[in-house]
Swiss-Prot record:
Keywords: Ribonucleoprotein, Ribosomal protein, RNA-binding, rRNA-binding
Gene Ontology cellular component annotations, sorted alphabetically: cytoplasm; small ribosomal subunit
InterPro entries (UniProt xref): Ribosomal_uS14 (IPR001209), Ribosomal_uS14_bac/plastid (IPR023036), Ribosomal_uS14_CS (IPR018271)
Signal peptide location: none
Coiled-coil intervals: none
Disulphide-bonded residues: none
Family designation: Belongs to the universal ribosomal protein uS14 family.
MF annotations from Gene Ontology: rRNA binding; structural constituent of ribosome
Name of the protein in question: Small ribosomal subunit protein uS14
Subunit structure comment from the entry: Part of the 30S ribosomal subunit. Contacts proteins S3 and S10.
Function description: Binds 16S rRNA, required for the assembly of 30S particles and may also be responsible for determining the conformation of the 16S rRNA at the A site.
One GO term (biological process): translation
Pfam families reported for this sequence: Ribosomal_S14
Length: 100
């Protein structure tokens, strides 16, 4: 199990990312279309003033049950350990052990 503080920190980042998503994309579009260098500097400064945790690159996928950040399967939203347990118990529809 991951520390609760880490899971809560990740939830806070998700809220911030959602809150500033529109403003960030708007500023990036303005930056892309700006022709003057001073204008680009001003837009870049505005981007820098946004909260650091609102950037999408700060997002870390975590397991829904354990909060584990490593070994994450996007299709299920689970870590490899929980995925294996749940698959053995038959809790994931359509998942079968491979055999060849």
């Amino acid at each position: 199990m991951a520390k609760k503080s880490m899971v809560e920190r990740e939830k806070k980042r998700a809220r911030l990312r959602q809150k500033y998503e529109a403003k960030r994309t708007e500023l990036k579009e303005q930056f892309r279309t700006a022709e003057d260098f001073e204008e680009k500097l001003a837009i870049h400064q505005k981007l820098q003033e946004l909260p650091r945790n609102s950037a999408p690159s700060r997002h870390r996928n975590r397991c829904l049950t354990t909060g584990r950040p490593r070994g994450y399967y996007r299709d299920f939203g689970l870590s490899r350990n929980v995925l294996r347990e749940w698959a053995h118990q038959g809790l994931l529809p359509g998942v079968v052990k491979s055999s060849w």
